[in-house]
């Protein structure tokens, strides 16, 4: 009873902290993704320089935050382009004596508030990149917006409020920016990192749009890069533990692989389990079940179709062994008794096909290929 209550309390405390992390751009989910990618690259590239690898990790995370601000700035650039179009159309209407065009979207109150945002403007002043250098992409996006049902319904809608202005941009982002191959290609040309980051960063841009409050005016807070130094340290500590204690972690895997030939495991499976074990042993406040679930999800995206189930079983076995031997001071729920095979088959529901993943779906092979093209001696200079 005591152990069960303690486990419940541990998960409750963790979930409270996790909700706080949702208010930062770089959260644990993104950090785990980056560490999977960079650990794979660390071993594949043969460049075993820990200092360079850590610089690459932090630089990669910083680039994700750059993308977050750059995508917010895209909303501003689209608004400015729309304003320019309305001005031209208004001048033509005066000359021809026709009805002046509506400036509702050009003067969208949410977009204007974002345009005046002190934090975004301060950040963009430090950047060399400007959407003004890619006006063809901005104009193409404007055309797509103007042709969309979302835009037409907004322009013809009766509700005239800040909430309606904010909501139309949330819909536009989800429909026309989040899934936009042309825009993705432009971003990939800007930075090698951004192609892998965009799917995760998109979710934070949408959260930011929903958080905007007209009462905050130009002082509306954007998501900070990190909540505090603890989050930044999480990335460095997890990556360092993964690499420096690799032999110990792989020994635990070998012991728990039972009838499997450890040398024949998918290489990405080994990487993912190695990082998961590092997290379990390095961070006492993260519940074991949370760690296992996070890395099972990563395995489904980055490794083989069967990796999720196998890694789930392996990590569960390893965690219980570490607890029983006193190497890890955490608790886990008692394993459920296995039901007869025929009963399990009868209850099984068909797997959903075509499920879209919720985090960046980048194959490990593509990650490695990209990293191998970069100059190992200038990892902190890559753009």
Language-model regions, residue ranges each:
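Class I Rossmann-like S-adenosyl-L-methionine
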Residues: 8, 19-383
């Amino acid at each position: 009873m005591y152990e069960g209550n303690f486990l419940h309390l541990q998960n409750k405390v963790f979930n409270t902290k996790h909700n706080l992390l949702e208010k930062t751009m770089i959260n644990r989910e993104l950090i785990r993704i980056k560490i999977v990618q960079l650990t794979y690259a660390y071993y594949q590239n043969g460049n075993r320089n820990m200092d360079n690898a850590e610089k690459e990790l932090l630089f990669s995370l910083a680039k994700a935050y750059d993308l977050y601000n750059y995508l917010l700035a895209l909303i501003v650039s689209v608004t400015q382009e729309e304003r320019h179009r309305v001005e031209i159309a208004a001048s033509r209407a005066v000359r021809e004596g026709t009805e002046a065009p509506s400036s509702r979207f050009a003067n969208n109150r949410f977009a204007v508030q974002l345009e005046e945002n002190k934090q975004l403007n301060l950040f963009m002043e430090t950047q060399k990149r400007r959407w003004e250098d890619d006006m063809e992409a901005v104009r193409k996006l404007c055309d797509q917006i103007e042709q969309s049902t979302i835009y037409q319904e907004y322009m013809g809608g009766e509700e005239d409020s800040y909430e309606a202005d904010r909501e139309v941009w949330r819909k536009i982002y989800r429909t026309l920016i989040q899934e936009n191959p042309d825009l993705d290609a432009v971003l990939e040309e800007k930075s090698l990192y951004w192609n892998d980051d965009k799917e995760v960063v998109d979710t934070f841009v949408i959260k930011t749009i929903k958080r905007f409050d007209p009462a905050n005016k130009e002082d509306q807070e954007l998501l900070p890069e990190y909540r505090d130094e603890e989050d930044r340290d999480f990335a460095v500590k997890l990556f360092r533990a993964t690499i420096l204690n690799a032999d110990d972690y792989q020994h635990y895997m070998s012991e728990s692989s039972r009838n499997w030939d450890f040398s024949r495991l998918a290489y990405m499976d080994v990487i993912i389990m190695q990082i998961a074990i590092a997290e379990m042993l390095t961070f006492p406040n993260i519940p074991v079940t949370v760690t296992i679930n996070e890395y099972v999800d990563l395995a489904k995206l980055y490794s083989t179709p069967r990796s999720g189930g196998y890694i789930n079983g392996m990590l569960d076995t390893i965690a219980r062994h570490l607890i029983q031997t006193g190497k890890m001071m955490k608790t886990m729920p008692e394993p459920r008794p296995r039901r007869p095979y025929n009963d399990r088959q009868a209850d099984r529901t068909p797997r959903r096909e075509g499920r879209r993943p919720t985090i960046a779906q980048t194959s490990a092979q593509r990650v490695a290929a990209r990293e191998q093209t970069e100059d190992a001696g200038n990892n902190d200079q890559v753009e």
